[in-house]
Amino acid sequence: MLNTQRAQEIAASPIMANVTYQEVPIYIQHVDEQNETARIYPLDNPELEQDVPLSQLMEH
């Protein structure tokens, strides 16, 4: 599970972090602190953007 601060660090970093959502490698585009969600997309399908709870993201 990612906390808000770590998710923001990953989103701002030029280095790709190994983060998954439902076991799928994803890229974090934006973090919404108030709602504790992140705008993400699967690395293999950039057009499939979605907002998900930070609690469902895993850093490996």
Curated annotation (Swiss-Prot):
One of its GO terms (biological process) is sporulation resulting in formation of a cellular spore. The keyword Glycoprotein does not apply. This is Small, acid-soluble spore protein H. The gene is sspH. The keyword DNA-binding does not apply. Keywords: Sporulation. Induction: Expressed only in the forespore compartment of sporulating cells. It comes from Halalkalibacterium halodurans (strain ATCC BAA-125 / DSM 18197 / FERM 7344 / JCM 9153 / C-125) (Bacillus halodurans). It is found in: Spore core.
